[in-house]
């Protein structure tokens, strides 16, 4: 086969572009199906506690005691979205509030995590919130410039 293109083209004459891969985030633990019951705030740090710990993602999926810490939370960019009727598509009603206001105003709650998303300085949880005998879909966005730390009991 004779190839007469330039070094910036492939065999079909298409200009090659540089490809950079953002590796998938493989967290050692998941909060999927865990029930968040408390946010403790110390300065710009959040300690998020669940009713029954965390689940390891190493294939065994063992449940372990633990909680999650977020450091250097940027409160002006951290939000909670409370969406109306759960599980439906189409139009909805809801409320957006600062995460700090949510933590201050809603003390007794259960937030069942269904999905976790990790991005650049951002952790997002989607799930269902139960508070004051109300049930709604909920999205919690935590913008943190510091580390996210999974704290577990070392049973070795």
What residue ranges belong to the model's regions?
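Surface-exposed, interaction-prone regions used to assemble/regulate multi-protein complexes
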Residues: 3-156
